[in-house]
Amino acid sequence: MTPLGRLHLLRVLSTPPVFLLGLLLALPLGAQGLSGVRFSASRTAHQPPQKHLTHGLLKPAAHLVGYPSKQNSLLWRANTDRAFLRHGFSLNNNSLLIPTSGLYFVYSQVVFSGESCSPRAIPTPIYLAHEVQLFSSQYPFHVPLLSAQKSVYPGLQGPWVRSMYQGAVFLLSKGDQLSTHTDGISHLHFSPSTVFFGAFAL
């Protein structure tokens, strides 16, 4: 007659695998050596996403304010009022130096003003123009990027004012230079909000 202990061992070994799987699933997680699994999964599911600060997202930008010079020309400044140079831009010989290649929005505004014409004087037109130019190693001369012109006929009605604003997107290369040329400088109405010039990377 087979001992009782051996019979019990034979029954366990002959138990179908499906039954053993069901028995394992019915055991507590601690008995399976999986304690904390449910807590860890829950914590991961409700954990707020971490914010990663990516360096190098600060893009070049420049804003210049116009001032008159002794040579009757338009002088740009970056260290006064609301003017600035950021993240690679520099001002050299009254020109903006492009720090990196890419797309840039270039803009400029000028405001002209003048007095009315004397009743005895013969009205003559005043030519006003403002242009943003590109100087690059790819071209042997200054290339116009933005250009605007106006003619004013001073009358007897009183002082006159004319404004010009220009802006567009350009593909520029590192080392390119942006400058301006203005006709009618003696009529420029200088202030930080009326005469300015700048660019920023997109």
From Swiss-Prot:
List the signal peptide residues: 1-33
CC terms in the record's Gene Ontology section: extracellular space; membrane
Kindly list every residue the record annotates as glycosylated. N93
Kindly indicate whether the keyword Signal belongs to this entry. yes
- Can you tell me which family this protein belongs to? Belongs to the tumor necrosis factor family.
Q: How does it assemble?
A: Homotrimer, and heterotrimer of either two LTB and one LTA subunits or (less prevalent) two LTA and one LTB subunits. Interacts with TNFRSF14.
What is the protein name given in its UniProt record? Lymphotoxin-alpha
Ranked from the top, the taxonomy reads: Eukaryota, Metazoa, Chordata, Craniata, Vertebrata
